[in-house]
Amino acid sequence: MNRIDEEPQIHEDPVENREEDDEDEDDQYEFDDGFLVNGSDDGEEEEEQRHCSEKKSRSRRKKDESFTLHEDDYLLLKDNNDTFQRNKYKRLKKSSEEEDKINNDDDDDDLSHFIVDEDDHGAQGMRRKKMKYKQGTDSNALRYANDVFGDPEELLKLRKKDLKYNEKIERKLEDEFEPMVLSEKYMTEKDDEIRKLDVPERMQIFEEAIGIVSLDDMSIQEESNWIYARLLQEQGQGCLINKDDIVKFLEMFHVQKLEIPFIAMYRKEQCRSLLDSSDDDHDGSDFNLDKKLETKWHKVLWMIQDLDRKWVLLRKRKTALFGYYTKRFEEETCMSDLNKSLFESVIKSLQAAETEREVDDVDSKFNLHFPHCEIDEGQYKRPNRKSQYSICSKFGIKEFANKFGYSAEQLGLALSLEKVFVDELEDAKKTPEEMALNYECAMFGDSQAVLKGARHMAAVEISCEPSIRKYVRGIFMENAVVSTSPTPDGNVVIDSFHRFSAVKWLSEKPLRKFDGVQWLLIQKAEEEKLLQVTFKLPENQMNRIISECSEHYLSVGVSKYAQLWNEQRKLILEDAVHGFVLPSMEKEARSLLTSRAKTQLLSEYGQVLWNKVSSGPYRRNNNTSEEEAAPRVLACCWGPGNPETTFVMLDSSGELVDVLYSGSIGLRSRDVNDQKRKKMDQDRFLKFIRDHQPDVLALAAVNLSCVRLKDEIYEAIFQMVEELPLNYVDDRIYDFPLVYADESLPRLYENSRISSEQLPQQAGIVKRAVSLGRYLQNPLAMISTLCGPGRDILSWKLHSFQDFLDPDEKYEMVEQVMVDITNQVGIDINLAASHEWLFSPLQFVSGLGPRKAASLQKSLVRAGSIFVRKELINHGIGKKVFVNAAGFLRIRRSGLACSSSQFIDLLDDTRIHPESYGLAQELAKDVYAHDTVRGDEDDAIEMAIEHVRDEPASLRKIVLDEYLRSKNQENKKETYSLIMRELSCGFQDWRSLFKEVDSDEEFYMISGETKETIGEGRIVQATVKKVTSGKAKCVLDCGLPGILLKEDYSDDGRDIVDLSNKLCEGDIVTCKVKSILKQRYHVLLVCKESEMRKHRNLGDVDDYYHEEKRNSVLIEKEKVPKEKKQFKSRMIVHPRFQNITAEQATVYLSDKNIGESIVRPSSRGLNHLTLMIKISDNVYANKEIIEGEKENKDIVSLQRIGKTLKIGNETFEDLDEVMDRYVDPLVTHLMTMLNHRKFRTGTKSEIDDLLRVEKGVNPKMVVYSFGVSHEHPGSFILSYIRSANPHHEYIGLYPKGFKFRKRMFGDLDKLAAYFKRHIDNQ
């Protein structure tokens, strides 16, 4: 290893300090592995040969072109003659490709004559052969075409006519579009089948993924038992669940093909215990018509569906394995009683397996005892690495292994208490060594080898026994603990603000205590080699396992033979438990922790989405009337100037009405011209408001400019109110609402494909503003818009750790949430038919999906409006789909239906399902008959329904329980509850009321930060804008203003009279957040050295996080003698900078990729930094960075980075520019060198030895190669041998290229070409 001292010498490149010539060289590069040094006479002769070669090549190409058939000609021949074949097509194509290579060779540069390993005669012969072959093929093809079809030109004319005619014929979609396009648009044949089949679309996808589901009573009962047991394990969620309700759910789902939203809405009576009834009408209290229902996420039903999928897949796998095992066993050549017994035990274990892991255990046991048969001789066989077990079995050791006593199966039965053996184990009358002598062979030459092999076989069999694994698994998962500690890299990287800081020092945390995403963080940190993770089973539990196994496996005999055999058995148990079972349990524990963490993270992710999508639209003055139209929204998105701040006006249907660009409305300049532009924009804005009369203004909160913009808007409105007469101003202007809105979703919409389809040719900021306004009007529809084939919704940042989830996992949760909420809200079909964007939630309606919804949408748009729910069957959906969807599709007089006088049934404007219309009509008639004397008229039903709709108070007179008893419908309380609510107010919005953002949300939206990034104690950088004697006004990188008081500047702040003597405008200060004034959008800062060094834990500290462990490690480090030179810590915040020594930097880069770099402090003082780059394994280059324009007021100023950075003659403004302009191009050239064909790894002497060998093979050639210079890291060595002795020259590595002999080369091949021509001009 190339030793790096604490402060290595900054090596100057050996080729530095030489002037660069301006002489230009030809653009040449080499293709040979060696070259000859030729005289000048040879050049003229070879030049003449090259011109001759080019002339012949052009002649050949000219001939070839005249005999080449176009691809269309071959297609024409094939179309008109079924027997026609393009003979030797592949050879013809190959010939063409090789000819191209020859032509390229003809065009090579001057270096082509250095190639000495090509057989010229062979090459010419090959070219002649190709010419003859190509000519014969082409002429035959043309002659055949002429004889059969005539002149090719006439054929081409006919072909063009045919093409024009075929364009008129309708082609298949598969021929017109790429498969990806057809898949995205759901236009494949499979999509057509899904659309046509009268089964809910999501159910079809579900069943396609899991296969055929057994629907007999026994299978459903067996599955319900399994699901119930799983639910009981989920933190007691199954305690209140009735198992019969699970059976009914499975029957409704699989047999009746009813989706979850339908079951939750219309089959409550059949699965009460599966529904959260805490706030429902059937919670045991009296029915209250005035109580507003709330949307509910039916998690238990979705959980049962997920368990249903797992059960079907588990059963499918068990069935497949049963058939496979049976077939394999029947093929066994030796069907002994032992094998039959083993097979029967495997089948019994397979039938009893209840989880995938238990099935894995059974599969391991079967494959151990019934390995794959050897393939017959002569057949191809993939080489397999034979296991030690199979080798022992092959040499007959298995027979001896069976003599240790109880088998693995017997031990497992005893541990599981399934069968207790009363007979004592009989010990052999020989020692193990004596008995092992009978099994010696060539592979196992002595008794100890035989014993070792036999013990291994017994241990493996024990480790593969399902009952034993289940026993150990139960103990391990309940008692195992996890500890974490940082690696050397992690100790440097993970500070108190790092995302892994909370899991840096965990000590013996039990598996069952892991919660949230903690394990995912540990797993990620381990992948990044920042943490070491250890699993451990406590000593007492380990002893328990060994003790219980020994109790059933060891002999109770006291003889010498019994003791000797027991010693062997103890070794077997130790090997089985420690060598096989526990390591596999650790893998299972990791998998289990990952699964649990992802499940919880998915739930949290879904909950955030649920909170957003279940939020109601903005209502004027919180008016909850369902009849009131959506508000007219004026949406505003701030623009920096290009684009300008933009206002868009949306009508109550969310359609774009008008756009106003106003780039000067928020100006705060006192310039006269700026003020004029501002006044003009204010007048235009006020006219915009007067013309369109919006109900609310939604302002996207993205930065502090939006706060000023809000003030300017209010100022303009107040000025208008003051100037205009009272009778001229609309009442709403006095209390004009302006709300902040989150711009994250509108930005996704702006860049999505659907926005271009819905708002073609509109500017991006207009699309964004439209989305902002629509989100206020209908959050559900706006979010659904991004749930199309592109799945743009997955880019919405809902959870800080959502990156740990796969896209498919996230979208499955998105679909679950969207399906549940959409069906509780419903869709106004007629309104959506007139406004396309409102159709976006249709795909989530029960029974539908993206394919069926798209088909239904097209049909409804063509129809314009629909007046009866039953008409939906005429729009391409079958009866089963109609049953699922009908109750959630709202039919009312909206959209184009407003202008129609056609009758619309009021029940179609409710959540009442058509199957319950009879009950609803009967209830309405009873109420109507009670309130009036007219009840026998023909139109009594319509009048009764209108009566209860107009006078919902009449329904309150009914005592529901008594009414149900009178109708003998006590088991339909939930159905009647829904009927009464919907008759009172159809499709009442159950979503939560719209809430404006609170002060915390407003602050984080405006700042663009989060609680994690701008919390108290966070290290930040601030730029000084203004300094007074007592304080400095700064600006953080996020744009927030900061205040640094004099007393917070340094520890001796009280002695500072005037802060302006310490700071200047433009200074960059590294400081810590002291506190946040969220109401004023200000941050108080501190940069005292004592405060900067304080360690602060953020958030809740884990109970198993032990700082003492961390401190003990630090104390141990302090005990180590400080042999290295110290450096001054620097107050620099940059991803590539670390306060570490050169040795620590070497350790940090040791396992990184070549080209990785780090910036660290320099021992040369506070005006220098060191850039360390990994050149090769164990070779690191150090580049000196000189800092300029630094203030020398105090130590804090010196610890900050300079305003200019200089490396060599290049000057940079900051470390980012150093990385972009210096490191990145330098690493690019480094990789070019390392990947060059002439590059060799090794030291200079090792490369010289390689060249000597190459020279011996080709004594007439000048052999050369490139290598890394270990003496001058950052440089390379050009080594070459002309006659006998190696010669060396250095090559410098720079961002601009490679420096060789005072010349800079941007291309390594050009450098090699220059070296060849000027090998004598050193």
From Swiss-Prot:
SUPFAM superfamilies membership: Nucleic acid-binding proteins, Ribonuclease H-like, RuvA domain 2-like, Tex N-terminal region-like
Cross-referenced InterPro entries: HHH_9, NA-bd_OB-fold, RNaseH-like_sf, RuvA_2-like, S1_domain, SH2_dom_sf, Spt6-like_S1, Spt6_acidic_N_dom
Keywords: Nucleus, Transcription, Transcription regulation
Superkingdom classification of source: Eukaryota
Record's protein name: Transcription elongation factor SPT6-like
Compartment(s) where it occurs, according to its Swiss-Prot or TrEMBL record: Nucleus
GO BP field: embryo development ending in seed dormancy; nucleosome organization; transcription elongation by RNA polymerase II; transcription elongation-coupled chromatin remodeling
Known function: Transcription elongation factor that enhances the transcription elongation by RNA polymerase II (RNAPII).
Biased composition (Acidic residues): 18-33, 97-110
Matches recorded under PROSITE patterns: S1 (PS50126)
GO CC annotations, alphabetized: cytosol; transcription elongation factor complex
CDD domains reported for this sequence: SH2_Cterm_SPT6_like (cd09928), SH2_Nterm_SPT6_like (cd09918)
Extent of Basic and acidic residues compositional bias: 1-17, 48-65
GO MF terms, alphabetically ordered: histone binding; nucleic acid binding; nucleosome binding
